[in-house]
């Protein structure tokens, strides 16, 4: 049985034993190395990251319906499970994405996150307005079982019925690209939604007389996706969200788009022109288009903002996995053998090794 030994797990010397691509058991203390074993070199072991909202990278995009190269990029950068996330697009394009092979080398792909197309025109952000349409549960059925998470604006006609039906199918429903009032968002959560999509972005903010979707999520115990790059949400506000919701309800996401990991220039993202300049991706009118740093870098930035490392890791592993109903993000017997080895000797954590499916990947 292969093992990963000489690691720190929750601060204690530990050994993880693998059977196939799963953890068989975890033992206290280090063990002698045998051929094929992995030497953790005294580094800290944490679960592989879980990104439940990521569109593209390297000039590629989920809408291309080819995930192989992107999955390798994710894994090399510490994300071992991810949900390729669609743009708001026409039904035939979404069907093509949901039919694309997901059994590829690299990060695990348990399903697709549909960001739209049932969103508010007033909060479309970088989504293509020509593809926005009213809720249609038959369309969602046509995209199952690949579609396992969906973003919707709860104030749209028919949205609550859609949310109930989606939740009954086991789909994780998240409210986003919405102009909903507090009351409308509460109704969405009561109908079965359980998250906010990229909290603060493409939705009303918190006002002392209009708490809006964020106030509703806080009241209803929902999860809150957060792009923690310091650009989409100011660091003090990101820290405020963490303190208000806690690490068990804030799910860090990359929201990576096509230009992530690619040179500066112009890109087509879901039919929208996006310009990457000085590390920021925007539409020609200045609208923020998406994030270009990895989820691991979001973890590092969360730590730099004042979030304890253990909480930052939880917000990028167990919490997003729970938000999207995924078997990932936890190191325990029977769970995926996806492990990051991290050096905590400096001011910020450094990723040293990625173990994916029980083998060293990067």
Question: What is each of the regions a protein language model found here?
Answer:
Residues 1-32, 355, 359-360:
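N-terminal metal-binding scaffold of metallo-dependent hydrolase/deaminase domains
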Residues 114, 166, 196, 302, ...:
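Conserved, mostly hydrophobic/aromatic
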Residues 143-262:
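Active-site core of metal-dependent hydrolases
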Residues 55-57, 68-96, 108-120, 145-155, ...:
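Divalent metal-dependent hydrolysis catalytic cores, especially in the metallo-beta-lactamase
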Residues 72-83, 121-146, 187-199, 210-223, ...:
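Active-site gating loops and adjacent loop-to-helix segments of metal-dependent hydrolytic enzymes
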Residues 216-225, 242-254, 259-342:
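His/Asp/Glu-enriched, well-ordered alpha-helical/loop segment
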Residues 3, 44, 48-50, 174, ...:
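Residue-level marker for buried hydrophobic side chains located in beta-strands
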């Amino acid at each position: 049985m292969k093992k990963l030994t000489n690691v720190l797990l929750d601060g204690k010397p530990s050994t993880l034993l693998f059977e196939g691509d799963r953890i068989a058991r975890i033992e206290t203390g280090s063990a002698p190395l045998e051929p094929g074993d992995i030497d953790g070199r005294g580094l800290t072991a944490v679960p592989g990251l879980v990104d439940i909202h990521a569109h593209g990278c390297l000039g590629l995009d989920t809408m291309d319906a080819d995930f192989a190269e992107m999955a390798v990029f994710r894994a090399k950068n510490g994300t071992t499970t991810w949900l390729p996330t669609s743009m708001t697009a026409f039904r035939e394009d979404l069907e093509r994405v949901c039919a694309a092979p997901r059994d590829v080398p690299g990060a695990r792909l348990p399903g697709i996150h549909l960001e739209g197309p049932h969103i508010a025109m007033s909060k479309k952000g970088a989504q293509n307005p020509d593809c926005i349409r009213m809720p249609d549960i038959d369309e969602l059925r046509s995209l199952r079982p690949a579609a396992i998470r969906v973003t919707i604006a709860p104030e749209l006609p028919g949205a609550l019925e859609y949310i109930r039906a989606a939740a009954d199918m086991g789909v994780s429903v998240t409210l986003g690209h919405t102009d909903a009032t507090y009351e409308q968002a509460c109704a969405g959560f009561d109908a079965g939604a359980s998250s906010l999509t990229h909290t603060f972005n493409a939705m009303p903010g918190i006002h002392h007389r209009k708490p809006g979707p964020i106030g509703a999520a806080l009241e209803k115990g929902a999860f809150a996706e957060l792009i923690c790059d310091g650009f989409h949400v100011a660091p003090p506000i990101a820290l405020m969200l963490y303190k208000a919701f806690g690490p068990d309800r804030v799910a860090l996401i990359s929201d990576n788009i096509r230009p992530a990991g690619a040179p500066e220039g112009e890109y087509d993202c879901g039919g929208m022109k996006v310009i990457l300049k000085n590390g920021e991706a925007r539409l020609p009118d200045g609208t923020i288009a998406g994030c270009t740093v990895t989820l691991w870098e979001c973890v590092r930035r969360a730590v730099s903002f004042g979030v304890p490392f253990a909480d930052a890791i939880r917000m990028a592993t167990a919490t997003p996995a729970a938000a999207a109903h995924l078997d990932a993000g936890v190191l325990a017997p029977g769970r995926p053998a996806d492990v990051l080895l991290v050096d905590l000797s400096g001011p910020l954590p450094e990723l040293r090794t990625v173990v994916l499916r029980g083998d060293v990947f990067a």
